[in-house]
């Protein structure tokens, strides 16, 4: 028996819960929100899909009662205000930091053994805050961003190469931000063959550029943050944990010397399993990639400094 709680019944949280229910990732999924009736209504709607989608996951909707989330194996935190058009992730930090601290207090109280996946933005900084505020071991606090960014990268690579998307592999490291992420073309492949064999340099550069503005593009089109892919990426990470898949996933991890960085949560490839982050994978970076990663870390630290300025940590 396994139990997962999703904090925040907005579009991302509800999508994550729905994907987990349909895939029967956990025995029980709890969706909690501060808005009266929102979680209950969405979980009732989801439950009424069960005969159509042939799943038997226990679904529980809760309004601000963390007792019902007790003993969760994994907690996915999506709660926070969404990014609006022309709003940077960094501008979200003041409000979302306060929300995160309140959530973490309740998660640690009722599910002290849980692995926490942070989805709310600015993701790397809020992952860092979750680690510091919770006092939990670093392997149990994971930021989702790299998984989403890598999925977007693979989609654009598939378009650039004309390859079947299921045969494309690609990875994005660095911060989860428009200017801080680093799509690694040098590591991207189609059926194990470098993508440079399938697409021109110009097309690959376009794939990188489109990936880096992927979130902003969607925000401009729909007027708010995306939800389908972020929700699915979160659900995929939960599945990797509960099924002990030992899956390599680019995600925000706390570094202690890896990649030349310390005391920071930032996107790197990691093996994800039942213990959370089971291993940070060291990949060789070119001089240019290493310089970009260092610059990305500097940018994330600049955002982290706001936490100290507002006395969040």
Features from the language model and the residues they span:
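Rossmann-like NAD(P)(H) cofactor-binding subdomain of soluble oxidoreductases
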Residues: 88-154
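Conserved N-terminal Rossmann-fold NAD(P) cofactor-binding segment
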Residues: 34-72, 301-309
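Rossmann-like NAD(P)-binding element
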Residues: 51-114
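N-terminal Rossmann-fold NAD(P) dinucleotide-binding loop
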Residues: 13-14
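C-terminal substrate-binding/catalytic lobe of Rossmann-fold NAD(P)-dependent dehydrogenases
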Residues: 134-140, 149-313
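Extreme N-terminal starter segment of soluble prokaryotic enzymes
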Residues: 1-4
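Glycine-rich Rossmann-fold phosphate-binding loop(s) that bind the pyrophosphate
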Residues: 9-10
